[in-house]
Every structure is written in structure tokens, then in C-alpha cells.
């Protein structure tokens, strides 16, 4: 296959049921566009990699990076972008919550602006939205609050710095890739923070859809990793997310132990 004009990187973990659906949707959306799809799977126990391999047998556009002993969405995205053959790389989740049709709008913006570095799919622009059942109301409000905090602390100029849906010029990404954290889930916020004001950004609003199959990867650990990223960025990357998480867990353990000891002494 000739050099593609677009690479799509899709990190996966336990998304076997969604592979056929996202492949079909991308095939329909990107018809007539020379593209490749790079799945980066963190050794999913549900057989996601095996499902992807079935499609590889009959489709030269599909590639798989099967990671063993390495975990984390950020690291998966970084590896996928490094492996991409195209100059433009789209990043999206496999859970079908991102609107693949917006990839065409992103491509159009790049074609009109050769100096453009990044296009972000945003849930929070005037024409962006979150489906009623995609988030609980509490999570939606929490997401908006965290977004405001992240933008303020890290001085990020984007309506949705926590988006997992974006398209980037590979050359622009590689300029700061050595300084990006492989731990965690919010690679875009890390990239925006490390790039500062040196990149040209545009946004495309989209509707964040409901997850149909599989389970959300959002957890308390995800939130801890996000705040660890913020602390790491404040410290200019001198301390890794992994070490900050270790400290947070360690301190919480000490706090619990002191609390229990205090209660025992009181009672």
C-alpha cells in the first residue's frame, strides 16, 4: 500500500465487541481516502487482539500493536503515533462514543491550513454536546469542573483539553513526544501543556455518544492519574506520574493508619 494520507490510532482494552463496528464505520466514512487503522491493544483478556487479527487477514489497511507488560492509554497513543505512516494522525476511542464522521471535518481544516498542528474534537463548543445517557449528570458536571481547573492551572487554550478525540500533525507531536508521560489517560492535556503556545489549534464540535457495548474505563484511579498529571506538569515534568501516584497512595495509607490508631486510643 502507498503511503497513506491519514493514520487512525485506536487504543483498546477489552473492546472485542466493538472492533467489527468501528472498522465498518471507518470504512464507510473514509471511503476514497488512503488511510490506515492502527489498533494498539494492551493485551486485553477478552481476546480483543485476536478479533483484530481476523480483520488484518483480509484488510491491509489494518495494523495491530499488541503490547505486553505495558499499560496505559497515553503510552498506547504515543506508540501508535510513532508507528503511523501518514503525516496526519487521528486518535479516537474504540467505544463508538466519538463521531467518526468528524474526521472528515478535521481533514478539511488541515487541507485549508498548512500551518495547523492540531484539531480537537470538543464536547464543549457551541455545536458540541454530550448525549443524555453518555454521562450521569454528576459525572457531566464533574467533567466540566475538572476541565476548567485543568485549563486554568496548565494554561491550556482549548474548550476540551481532556478529549480523547483529535487529529494531529505527526511532526508537531514528535517535537515534544520525549517529554510526554506514558502513564495515565489524558494524552491530549499533556501534549497541550508541553507544547505551550507553540502550536496552532482549531476545534470541531461533536456529540459524545452513548457507549453501547463494553464497560467504561473511568475509575477513581483515572481521576488520581489526572491530578497526578497536573502536579507533574506544575513541576515541569521533573517527577513522573507513577511516582506521584505512589506518594498519594502511600500518604493515604499513612493517614488511614493514623486515623485507626487514633480511634483505638480514644475508644
Language model: regions and residue ranges:
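Acceptor/aglycone-binding surface of glycosyltransferases and processive sugar-polymer synthases
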Residues: 65-83, 88, 100-185, 211-221
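Short beta-strand/loop segment that forms part of the nucleotide-sugar
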Residues: 34-44, 65-66
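Hydrophobic helical membrane-anchoring modules
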Residues: 1-5, 148, 155-156, 179-266
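A conserved acidic beta->alpha catalytic loop
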Residues: 41-50, 96
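N-proximal low-complexity "stem/linker" segments adjacent to membrane-targeting elements
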Residues: 1-28
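Active-site acidic short loop of glycosyltransferases
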Residues: 3-4, 59, 84-87
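Acidic helix N-cap motif at the loop->helix transition within catalytic regions
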Residues: 17-21, 46-54
Amino acid at each position: 500500500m502507498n503511503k497513506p494520507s491519514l493514520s487512525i490510532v485506536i487504543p483498546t482494552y477489552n473492546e472485542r465487541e466493538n472492533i467489527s463496528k468501528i472498522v465498518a464505520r471507518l470504512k464507510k466514512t473514509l471511503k476514497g481516502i488512503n488511510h490506515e487503522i492502527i489498533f494498539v491493544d494492551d493485551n486485553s483478556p477478552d481476546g480483543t487482539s485476536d478479533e483484530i487479527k481476523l480483520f488484518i487477514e483480509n484488510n491491509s489497511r489494518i495494523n495491530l500493536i499488541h503490547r505486553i507488560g505495558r499499560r496505559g492509554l497515553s503510552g498506547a497513543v504515543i506508540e501508535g503515533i510513532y508507528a503511523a505512516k501518514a503525516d496526519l494522525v487521528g486518535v479516537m476511542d474504540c467505544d463508538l462514543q466519538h463521531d467518526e464522521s468528524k474526521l472528515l471535518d478535521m481533514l478539511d481544516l488541515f487541507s485549508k491550513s498548512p500551518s495547523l498542528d492540531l484539531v480537537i474534537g470538543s464536547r464543549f463548543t457551541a455545536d458540541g454536546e454530550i448525549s443524555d445517557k453518555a454521562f450521569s449528570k454528576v459525572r457531566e458536571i464533574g467533567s466540566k469542573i475538572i476541565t476548567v481547573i485543568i485549563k486554568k492551572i496548565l494554561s491550556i487554550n482549548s474548550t476540551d483539553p481532556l478529549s480523547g478525540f483529535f487529529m494531529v500533525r505527526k511532526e508537531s507531536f514528535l517535537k515534544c513526544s520525549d517529554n510526554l508521560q506514558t502513564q495515565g489517560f489524558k494524552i491530549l492535556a499533556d501534549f497541550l501543556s508541553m507544547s505551550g503556545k507553540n502550536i496552532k489549534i482549531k476545534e470541531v464540535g461533536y456529540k459524545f455518544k452513548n457507549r453501547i457495548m463494553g464497560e467504561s474505563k473511568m475509575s477513581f484511579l483515572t481521576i488520581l492519574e489526572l491530578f497526578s498529571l497536573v502536579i507533574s506538569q506544575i513541576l515541569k515534568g521533573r517527577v513522573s506520574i507513577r511516582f506521584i501516584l505512589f506518594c498519594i497512595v502511600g500518604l493515604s495509607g499513612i493517614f488511614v493508619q493514623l486515623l485507626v490508631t487514633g480511634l483505638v486510643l480514644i475508644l
